[in-house]
Amino acid sequence: MSEIDVEIVAVEREIWSGKATFVFTRTTSGEIGILPHHIPLVAQLVDDAAVKIEREGSDDLWWAIDGGFLSITDTKVSILAESAQARADIDEAKAKTDSGSEDPRVAAQGRARLRALGQTV
């Protein structure tokens, strides 16, 4: 199966990079699924985005993304975020608490983490 290079970069450093067969996330224009050889595109991610990365022969990866942009070329997907948190590092109780915050930014971060955990918000 064909693969595409994927990188998740936060303000301070590269968070993750590797190969994927499919990437799924939400932009301000709607949901997007990306396969290798996708048309070039730049899009703004929603504030409470979760990113799913499917890899051949490996478990899917989920990331909670705090705002940012998505850049797609024929061979690469770049996710440029203010911050990103892997599913394995998410504290579910804190994410639930944060999702109910009166601060819109904190609430968006909480929702993104819950989505990365596979919960419907």
UniProtKB/Swiss-Prot annotation:
Subcellular location: Cell membrane
Annotated keywords: ATP synthesis, Cell membrane, CF(1), Hydrogen ion transport, Ion transport, Membrane, Transport
Cited Pfam families: ATP-synt_DE_N (PF02823)
Topological type in the membrane: Peripheral membrane protein
Gene Ontology MF term list: ATP binding; proton-transporting ATP synthase activity, rotational mechanism
Any GO CC annotation of this UniProt entry: proton-transporting ATP synthase complex
Family of this protein: Belongs to the ATPase epsilon chain family.
Protein purpose: Produces ATP from ADP in the presence of a proton gradient across the membrane.
Assembly and interaction partners: F-type ATPases have 2 components, CF(1) - the catalytic core - and CF(0) - the membrane proton channel. CF(1) has five subunits: alpha(3), beta(3), gamma(1), delta(1), epsilon(1). CF(0) has three main subunits: a, b and c.
Name of this chain's protein: ATP synthase epsilon chain
Gene: atpC
